[in-house]
Amino acid sequence: MCNDDTVNELKKDFHYTLSKFSHEIRNPLTLINSGLQMIASAHPEAEDYEHWDDVMDNLSYVRELLDELSAFNNAGRVKPEATDTGMYLKTVLSSVKPTLDYLDIRLVTDIPNDLPTLMLDRIQIRQMLLNLLKNAWEAVPVPGGQISVTAFTEKSGICINIQDNGCGISKEQLASIFQPFFTTKENGTGLGLAISRQVAEAHHGSISIESTPGPRQTHE
């Protein structure tokens, strides 16, 4: 059985390896992307090539994967600051409202003004919330989708409930939903929910999902 020192050393090695891997991949990826942009600039007809969009989409996917690997690597290391949680949540939700309006998805919110001030890493909590909201809006029907977000004080913290009228997932999928790289989406990285759980736990919280096949899914 590993002792705490061994576990911590393994974690440090893992974080270092993941960071180095991301760095080593990102540099040539940037050069490839720049090279393709130069080709397109010098030879506009290149964009008419039938697989050009596929190439650019794949590059975008790898960039997104590297960004999420970096977020996953840093999710447990927080820089908390005193945060008015009510105002903060309203700001985050306002930032996604234009996207949801464009997609014709209704956003219903109930965020009290008297939520407590908490020590939060605002960048990481924002990413966690955006991951959960993105999961919701990708699951709901368009048009006709609805996402409800409520928050309330619970013990020494708050509970945030995100509910949607999407298609839901099976019990088997639910058992693996927080595992890194597990995804039910064709172009998903499978890291969003794993990152979200790490962020919640780094703030001494937890995250859970209730879902069954059919409409209605809840994140807390």
Locate each region found by the language model.
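Conserved DHp (HisKA) dimerization/phosphotransfer helix of two-component histidine kinases, i.e.
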Residues: 49-99
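Short beta-strand/loop element within the Bergerat-fold HATPase_c
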Residues: 146-156
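Conserved catalytic submotifs in the C-terminal HATPase_c
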Residues: 101, 106-116
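Short alpha-helical Gxxx[C/S/T] motif in the catalytic ATP-binding
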Residues: 192, 196
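Conserved micro-motifs of the catalytic ATP-binding
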Residues: 76-78, 117-120, 184
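Short conserved segment of the HATPase_c
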Residues: 169-181
